[in-house]
Regions:
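Glycine-rich phosphate/adenylate-binding loop and adjacent beta-alpha elements
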Residues: 20-43, 48
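Ferredoxin-type iron-sulfur electron-transfer modules in oxidoreductases and energy-metabolism complexes
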Residues: 1, 44-167
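Short, charged low-complexity intrinsically disordered segments located at boundaries
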Residues: 17-27, 162-167
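Secreted/processed peptides and extracellular or luminal domains of membrane proteins
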Residues: 14, 19-22, 39, 114-120, ...
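A basic, amphipathic helix-loop patch mediating RNA/tRNA/ribosome contacts
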Residues: 1-21
Length: 167
């Protein structure tokens, strides 16, 4: 049997990520675990590969070590501003428009498909999604600059490629 990673089987965690026919997660706009075989035609040749990035070393077959993404989040995914106890923090007023934008920014499930799809294996899209999400809420604004610097430095340390404009 071929080793592969999975967790939720609901399309919300991204652990199932592989490259199918050269496309991260395959030809549909979904995660691999939500991709159905009916997407393909009879007789189609289907090629599956692990994520391709120096920062994602292959553990076995289609399983890669994605802990580099976790370390980027850990480098800047914190809010150290004292908001009191949990009920107090939940009482911080957030305008609906800001809450909606933060919710949309949180749509990134952290699977690494953007890294796998990038010819340079850049984690800039992943990192910017996390930075944007944390910046949109008032609790994260006081330390935003430090968070961005920490996350970008960690991204560089992990060996992700640089962004370039590819036409």
């Amino acid at each position: 049997p071929i080793a592969f990673d999975s967790d939720c089987r609901e399309g919300i965690c991204g652990q199932c990520g592989i490259v199918i026919n050269g496309i991260a997660h395959g030809p549909e706009v979904t995660t691999t675990c939500q991709l159905h075989m009916r997407t393909f035609h009879d007789g189609d040749v289907i090629t599956i590969e692990p994520w391709r990035a120096e920062a994602f070393p292959i553990i076995k077959d289609l399983v890669v070590n994605r802990s580099a993404l976790d370390r980027i989040v850990q480098a800047g995914g914190y809010i150290s501003v004292n908001t009191g106890a949990a009920p107090d923090a939940n009482g911080t007023p957030v305008p609906k428009q800001d809450a909606d934008r933060a919710f949309e920014a949180a749509a990134c499930i952290g699977c690494g498909a953007c890294v796998a799809a990038c010819p340079n294996a850049s984690a800039m899209l992943f990192t910017s999604a996390k930075v944007t999400h944390l910046h949109l809420l008032p609790q994260g604004k006081p330390e935003n600059y430090r968070r961005v610097v920490n996350m970008l430095n960690q991204m560089d340390e992990e060996g992700f490629g640089s962004c370039t404009n590819i036409g």
